A protein has these predicted regions:
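Sec/Tat signal peptide C-region and signal peptidase I cleavage site
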Residues: 18-22
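Accessory, solvent-exposed terminal regions and/or long lumenal/extracellular loops of proteins
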Residues: 627-712
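Catalytic-domain carbohydrate-binding cleft regions of carbohydrate-active enzymes
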Residues: 24-622, 627
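Bacterial N-terminal signal peptides
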Residues: 8-17
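Bacterial N-terminal signal peptides that target proteins for export
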Residues: 1-9
Length: 712
């Protein structure tokens, strides 16, 4: 027995020695360290990344101060898979893991960021399963895998050496909750990846949380810069609308001066939708070229709904038959976007049929997976699906949205046209993608929470408006929508806009609200603010692109030294100077925490001292935002849509006697020419009671005309 025991110990020592020798540490980019061990997966997020890191911008960030020694990360490769042990201090808090819906702070939690179409829980299921988290200690961790992964965020202790005699929580438990409470704190994050034959982790160093997040976004290719028209309103028609219905609705918007830039068509525009044919339905849209032309004349861009499961009636079905998975979805093929054959076939057809004819963007649906919490939800392809490229169903599920988007957006890059898509799933390193995530869920508080949560992972989120229970709720949801990355009214099951009738059944029966014109006026006022806000918002996106600072982000990103911000999930920064605090559902008041410094209520210019909480009330047509003292806020005269020749007439509001300079990004708003330095930086300054404007750059056009200055 002793001989066998000794042999076992020797074997373990040898395995451990080999493991240590096999682990490699390498600096990958400025402030980014990679730690690897064993056999790495072919279809990892890093291997699938198409954009080049912006290393010059990464190098310009503050000097790196490592939060811990990369060699202290322990990677174990076993017969089950791979396990990471990553240091975690008691004093730090964690955030991220993609588009989390049911949670904000992640320390002390078990997280499984797995793609799911109805992620109504706090386990980690999500539309965007990003295996990336950030720490208030000033670093980010990205686990480079497309496999289903579980993170134990300081929840479990591994036995090392002698086992102590702690009796545990159950010994004195008085309630069921106490009985099952885990009081064990561990100094590590444990990451479990079944099936993986090796480990690959990227450390994004700070020195601050914000700097670490910037490095992640810049490593991903820089943040997204959508076409400027994408920041206006997108209105989606009822699913069974016909061509004349679209004309009538466009006329309604223009006749009533309701701002709108994009109209979206839902499933019935195709001959078959589940699965998709990608062929215009002649019964509903007999003249699609005429439709596109007429909408263009009205300043409206066209967005088409689809998903990537290819019906036998599709012209590309035959070509994709040998380049798809071995299971169908809704009797349609699942293209192997991870290979080299399917993407060009899929993309080329869309370019010739839609993009070249003027379709401006797409809504890419159903690219997540069936609801994992329900046994009867089985529409998605199974995890054991095999694809010609070698990727399996599990990894394809995690990457399907990102790969699908890459194929579709390549058409616009080839055509030198920027766009702004809608999508239901993305994975890691997606920061550069001009696309907002959406969900079929509809809990308003969760919609608000996902705005700051999205910023932790290089994602954009659209809290779309559908039906409501009251006028108040409709206005509150609209306020949230105009203070997000993409403002969408999704009326796919509503015959008329929800401001004419918020009740679904009454809306579709043609029974409008008695005060519908008054509600319409309220919504118009809110949408006009969105249009006035575009110059500021567009410039925030430009900073995202160039410096990696998310345009929408949690307060803790900017104020990590303030522990009061650690659990503020229902407020967020927009750009550098605006703090948004939306009201959920039909609330008349809410509590707001303001960080250090003085803050101005945008609606009445009342000044609040930071470092405190306040109870505020916001009217239905007011904007629930606070402006940082020392800011210059450019507010434009609202336009009904963004045209190629639009010039925004701007009034600059100066908050305080002394103000920092503010930069507006100026280019054509529609092409990638800015990547060749065809842009201007318009700097707004305030000195000695007077405003100053300086413009530098090579762009010959003009987006902004500074008309007035107001000192508050």
């Amino acid at each position: 027995m002793a001989r066998k025991f000794s042999a076992g110990i020797i074997a373990l020592v040898l395995v451990f020695s080999l493991s240590v020798k096999a682990q490699q540490v390498k600096d990958l980019a400025p402030g980014v360290t990679r730690v690897t061990q064993g056999e790495l997966d072919q279809f990892s997020p890093y291997n699938l990344l198409q954009e080049k890191p912006k290393t010059a911008a990464m190098a310009a960030l503050p000097a790196v101060t490592a939060a811990f020694d990369p060699k202290s990360i322990r990677i174990e490769v076993t017969s089950r898979g791979t396990v990471f042990h990553i240091p975690l201090a008691d004093s730090e808090e964690l955030y991220g893991f993609g588009l989390q819906m049911g949670s904000f702070k992640q320390k002390g939690m078990r997280r499984r960021p797995i793609v799911n179409d109805n992620p109504l829980n706090d386990l980690g299921y999500t539309h965007a399963p990003t295996t990336f988290y950030l720490s208030t200690k000033g670093y980010g961790i990205f686990i480079n895998t497309s496999r289903y992964t579980t993170f134990y965020c300081g929840t479990h202790q591994q036995i090392k050496g002698d086992v102590n005699t702690n009796t545990g929580a159950g010994a004195s438990a008085q309630t069921v909750e106490d009985l099952y409470k885990n009081n064990n704190r561990s100094g590590e994050v444990i990451v479990d990846i079944p099936g993986a034959k090796g480990g690959d982790v990227f450390i994004f160093n700070g020195p601050t949380l914000k700097n670490a997040l910037q490095r992640y976004n810049l490593f991903s290719g820089g943040g997204a810069l959508p076409a400027m028209w994408g920041l206006g309103l997108q209105y989606r028609m009822k699913a069974d609308s016909k061509q004349q219905d679209v004309y009538n609705m466009v006329s309604y918007f223009r006749d009533n001066h309701i701002p709108c830039d994009v109209f979206g068509l839902e499933p019935k525009w195709q001959t078959t939708a589940y699965s998709c044919s990608y062929v215009w339905n002649p019964e509903y849209f007999p003249a699609p070229d005429e439709l596109i032309a007429k909408m263009k004349n009205q300043g409206i861009k066209l967005n088409l709904w689809e998903h990537a499961y290819v019906n036998p009636a599709s012209p590309i079905f035959g070509a994709l038959a040998g380049a798809s998975g071995d299971y169908k979805v809704w009797n349609g093929l699942v293209p192997d976007f991870a290979g080299k054959t399917a993407s060009p076939i899929f993309a080329d057809y869309h370019k010739k049929t839609f993009v070249d004819k003027g379709v401006a963007s797409f809504k890419m649906d159903e690219c997540d997976n069936s609801n994992l919490s329900e046994g009867g939800a089985v529409w998605g392809f199974p995890d054991q699906t095999q694809f010609p490229s070698g990727i399996d169903g599990e990894q394809m599920h995690q990457q399907f949205g990102s790969l699908y988007f890459q194929a579709m957006y390549s058409n616009y890059k080839k055509s030198n046209k920027r766009s702004y898509f809608n999508i239901r799933s993305l994975n890691g390193f997606a920061s550069s993608y001009p696309v907002s995530l959406y969900s079929d869920t509809y809990v308003h508080k969760e919609y608000i929470r996902m705005i700051p949560n999205s910023g932790f992972s290089g994602l954009l989120w659209s809290p779309e408006v559908r039906e409501s229970a009251s006028v108040t709720e409709l206005c509150r949801r609209t306020q949230t929508a105009i203070l997000s990355s993409q403002t969408v009214f999704n009326s796919w099951y509503l015959k008329s806009p929800p401001w004419l009738q918020y009740d679904r059944d009454k809306n579709n029966q043609g029974e409008m609200l008695r005060d519908s014109k008054d509600v319409e006026s309220k919504v118009r006022t809110l949408l006009n603010f969105r249009m006035s806000f575009i110059p500021y918002l567009y410039s925030a996106f430009a900073k995202y692109n160039q410096e990696g600072v998310p345009p929408f982000r949690a307060l803790v990103v900017d104020y990590p030294e303030d522990k009061n911000t650690y659990n503020v999930w229902d407020e967020y920064m927009i750009g550098d100077n605006v703090l948004a605090a939306p009201l959920a559902d039909s609330a008349a008041t809410r509590k707001v925490y303001l960080p250090k410094g003085n803050w101005y209520d945008y609606n009445n210019n009342k000044v609040y001292a930071g470092g405190q909480s306040y109870t505020i009330s916001t009217g239905l047509t007011e904007i629930p935002i606070f402006i940082k003292e020392g800011a210059i806020l450019p507010i434009a005269k609202p336009v009904e849509f963004v045209a190629p020749n639009t010039v925004f007439d701007i009034t600059c509001y100066v908050y305080g006697k002394v103000a920092d300079t503010v930069q507006l990004f100026e280019d054509d708003g529609t092409t990638f020419n800015f990547e060749k330095d065809a842009f201007n930086t318009t700097t707004l300054g305030w000195q000695n009671g007077k405003g100053r404007v300086t413009r530098k750059g090579t762009y010959k056009g003009k987006l902004y005309d500074i008309k007035n200055w107001v000192n508050l």
